[in-house]
């Protein structure tokens, strides 16, 4: 896989995201600027400028009409993708660590950090759209839902929506994962999963299960309804991000030795690679090198044809999957396919 390097940020990347169609990549960074790129060739469409601090998170709605950013400058901004202009700003008492549109695009989830005596919360904001153009016409200024952190939990680091926006899944600094009713904010359950802070949560294409990644070098897949642990993946370095690939039964893990702990310039020592694991068998099947610092985020194209990594080195790298990626199968998978083919032929 020959990567396309996206050069446009001056400081470490914090998140990269594809739109639903997979033709655009959105990136944000500690340089307070977000960028929009064509995923096919890495050409930059433009920048989103207006924040005055680190942009910790970015997301794009299902219609690629608008995108939302959350920043350390205590603000959440909504942007019109076509023009790159700010169409609304919400202010908060603390930095925003994660933002995400609901699957229907009518709600925005924001994770507020637990700093400066603020206990931390998940705020949900509502927007109203034109039924035809899907353009946002109205913003509700106050959050319609504020989910405060449970007493016996540490602050929320990241959160996301389940299928149809039914639940909000939240990950905590103490390694716990919580589930809330997205309509009422009611706490449903929580489990102790990781031994260190959880840095990322990403969902399967149908949003019925999700993967978490942590500084404890582990990634887990959990079922949304039962909160049961389905799979686990162990890496040899702290993990910052993990995603689930469509089309193929793989997961991609990204991380590496923390930048402040690196005492050598060798990328091999820091383990700055994207790791591919088989989703079912939990085996590591390959690595992709390239970054010369930890991978802060990995995101996969919803169409399953590429993935993008954002690094501490200030670069994002788009990797388009080659034929060998799609052809890769375990012997047991090949045998199962051959058996199915024979049964179909004889039927």
Curated annotation (Swiss-Prot):
* Start-end of each WD repeat: 8-47, 50-89, 91-135, 151-190, 193-232, 290-329
- One Pfam family linked to the record: EIF3I
Organism superkingdom:
Eukaryota
Query: Which GO BP terms apply?
Result: formation of cytoplasmic translation initiation complex
Q: What is its main location?
A: cytoplasm
UniProt-annotated location(s): Cytoplasm
Q: Which UniProt keywords are present, listed alphabetically? A: Cytoplasm, Initiation factor, Protein biosynthesis, Repeat, WD repeat
Q: Give any GO molecular function from the UniProt entry.
A: translation initiation factor activity
**GO terms for cellular component:** eukaryotic 43S preinitiation complex; eukaryotic 48S preinitiation complex; eukaryotic translation initiation factor 3 complex, eIF3e; eukaryotic translation initiation factor 3 complex, eIF3m; nuclear periphery
Q: Which PROSITE patterns match?
A: WD_REPEATS_2, WD_REPEATS_REGION
List the InterPro entries: eIF3i (IPR027525), WD40/YVTN_repeat-like_dom_sf (IPR015943), WD40_repeat_dom_sf (IPR036322), WD40_rpt (IPR001680)
Quaternary structure (record): Component of the eukaryotic translation initiation factor 3 (eIF-3) complex.
As for family, the record states:
Belongs to the eIF-3 subunit I family.
What is the recorded function of this protein according to its Swiss-Prot or TrEMBL entry? Component of the eukaryotic translation initiation factor 3 (eIF-3) complex, which is involved in protein synthesis of a specialized repertoire of mRNAs and, together with other initiation factors, stimulates binding of mRNA and methionyl-tRNAi to the 40S ribosome. The eIF-3 complex specifically targets and initiates translation of a subset of mRNAs involved in cell proliferation.
HAMAP family listed in its UniProt record: eIF3i (MF_03008)
* The protein, known as: Eukaryotic translation initiation factor 3 subunit I
In its UniProt entry, the species of origin is given as Vanderwaltozyma polyspora (strain ATCC 22028 / DSM 70294 / BCRC 21397 / CBS 2163 / NBRC 10782 / NRRL Y-8283 / UCD 57-17) (Kluyveromyces polysporus)
């Amino acid at each position: 896989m020959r990567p396309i390097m996206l050069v446009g940020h001056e400081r470490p990347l914090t998140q990269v995201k594809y739109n639903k169609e997979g033709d655009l990549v959105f990136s944000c960074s500690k340089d307070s600027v977000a960028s929009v790129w064509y995923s096919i060739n890495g050409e930059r469409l433009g920048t989103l400028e207006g924040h005055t601090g680190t942009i910790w998170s970015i997301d794009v709605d299902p219609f690629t009409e608008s995108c939302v950013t959350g920043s350390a400058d205590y603000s959440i901004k909504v942007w019109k993708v076509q023009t790159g202009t700010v169409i609304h700003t919400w202010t908060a008492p603390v930095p925003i660590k994660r933002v995400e549109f609901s699957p229907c695009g009518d709600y925005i989830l924001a994770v507020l950090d637990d700093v400066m005596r603020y206990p931390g919360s998940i705020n949900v904001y509502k927007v109203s759209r034109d039924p035809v153009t899907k353009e946002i016409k109205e913003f509700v200024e106050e959050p319609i839902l504020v989910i405060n952190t449970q007493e016996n939990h540490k602050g929320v680091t990241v959160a996301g929506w389940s299928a149809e926006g039914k639940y909000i899944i939240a990950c905590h600094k103490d390694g716990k994962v919580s589930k809330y009713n997205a309509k009422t904010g009611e706490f449903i359950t929580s489990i102790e999963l990781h031994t260190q802070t959880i840095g990322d949560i990403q969902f399967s294409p149908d949003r019925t299960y999700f993967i978490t990644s942590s500084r404890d070098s582990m990634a887990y897949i959990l079922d949304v309804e039962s909160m049961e642990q389905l799979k686990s993946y162990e890496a040899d370095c702290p993990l910052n991000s993990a995603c689930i690939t469509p089309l193929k039964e793989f997961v991609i893990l990204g991380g590496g030795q923390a930048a402040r702990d690196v005492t050598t310039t060798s990328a091999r020592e820091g383990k700055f690679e994207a790791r591919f694991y088989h989703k079912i068998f939990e085996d590591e099947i390959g690595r992709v090198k390239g970054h010369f610092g930890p991978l802060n985020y990995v995101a996969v194209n919803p169409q399953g044809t590429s993935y993008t990594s954002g690094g501490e080195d200030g670069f994002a790298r788009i990797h388009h999957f080659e034929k060998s990626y799609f052809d890769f199968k375990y012997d047991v998978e090949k045998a199962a396919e051959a058996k199915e083919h024979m049964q179909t032929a004889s039927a």
